């Protein structure tokens, strides 16, 4: 019998790890806990979409064959239990269990192997009016849609980018 693998984080690192593990190990139970509402998208490609080089936003969260990479897809196609809306609040390493909140309910999940693939979060600058209209993070799919809508609505031609990571560059 395989091991029970819990992966915290279901975007790039977490889902890639889960898929790779499944290819190498058909017997282990693989559970992914993702805090947000979306799984498996490629945020580093978002600037290419805004810039017009990538034509369809679906290319970030769909397979090349057009299937949306959501919980149902990972369960039926990959044999991975990928759960969205699960905020991990504690890790008890000696007891090998994680505590998380799903739909307001506190739950625990035991594991044999734990993988942390939580990624990062954009830094909001501690400045006055940092949340004013026209100031956006550019990390999550909904950020991209907000930026795209504002560009069209206000006919934006000039922008300032703060950040020199893969997305900012």
Regions found by a protein language model. Give the residues of each.
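FAD-binding core/adjacent interface of flavoenzyme oxidoreductases
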Residues: 1-8, 68-159
């Amino acid at each position: 019998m395989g091991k029970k693998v819990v992966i915290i984080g279901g975007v790039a690192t977490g889902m890639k790890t889960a898929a790779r593990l499944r290819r190498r190990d058909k017997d282990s139970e693989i559970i992914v806990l993702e805090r947000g509402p979306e799984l498996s998208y490629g945020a580093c490609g978002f600037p290419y979409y805004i810039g017009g080089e990538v034509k369809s936003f679906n290319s970030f969260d769909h397979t090349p064959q057009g299937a949306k990479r959501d919980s149902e897809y990972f369960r039926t196609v990959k044999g991975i239990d990928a759960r969205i809306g699960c905020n991990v609040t504690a890790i008890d390493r000696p007891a090998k269990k994680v505590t998380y909140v799903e739909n307001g309910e506190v739950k625990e999940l035991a594991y044999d192997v734990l993988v942390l693939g939580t990624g990062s979060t954009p830094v909001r600058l501690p400045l006055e009016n940092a949340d004013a209209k026209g100031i956006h993070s550019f990390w999550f799919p909904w950020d991209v849609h907000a930026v795209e809508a504002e560009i069209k609505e206000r006919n934006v031609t000039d922008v300032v980018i703060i950040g020199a990571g893969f997305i900012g560059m």
